[in-house]
Design a protein with these regions (language model features):
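Mature-chain termini and adjacent capping regions
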Residues: 1-166
Length: 166
């Protein structure tokens, strides 16, 4: 065997090859506007699969016609091309308020985000609050392109109309 050839049965180790402090990455749309921003105080990169793990990440998705959506969690894993962000532990999704709509906050244990597609989903329990209203369910699909979310099962909630409380 040549010295430069790796043995065929060699198992690649998943060790960090680089670390970054105060990491910030931005992706731009075709018009040069920021589509999303991903920041974290600490990131480890892994050469074996070109993935990264982040501590306390925050992902902010922007649309010109809608308020920003901020997603945070205690941990995240980003795939090699950044197409998928897996967040886990204390995940919070917040849609900023507008003059017409109050802020909306969702909490869940984990969330899989596809930032380029503008979508996310979880199979876990979810709780969403907006002012005094709340809704709970298991499993959720989010489409930031249409500003919609769909809870998949076991849905319960309490809705207070803004008109009724004014």
């Amino acid at each position: 065997m040549n010295r430069d050839e790796a043995p065929k049965n060699k198992v690649l180790r998943h060790d960090a090859d680089a670390t970054v402090e105060n990491m910030s990455a931005r992706r731009f749309d075709e018009n040069g506007q920021v589509k999303y921003r991903l920041v974290a105080p600490f990131m480890k990169h892994f050469a074996d699969d070109d993935s990264s793990e982040l501590d306390s990440p925050t992902l902010v998705a922007y649309r010109p016609d809608a308020p920003p959506v901020t997603i945070s969690g205690r941990h995240a894993r980003v795939t090699s091309k950044g197409d998928v962000v897996y967040l886990w532990e204390n995940v919070v999704v917040n849609r900023a308020a507008t003059p017409e709509r109050p802020a909306m906050t969702g909490t869940m244990p984990d969330l899989i985000v596809q930032p380029n597609a503008g979508t996310a989903f979880t199979n876990s329990a979810v709780e969403i609050t907006q002012e005094k209203s709340w809704i709970k369910g298991v499993g959720m699909q989010i489409d930031n392109n249409t500003s919609t979310f769909v809870l998949q099962s076991q849905v319960t909630g309490l809705y207070f109309s803004r008109k009724a409380t004014q």
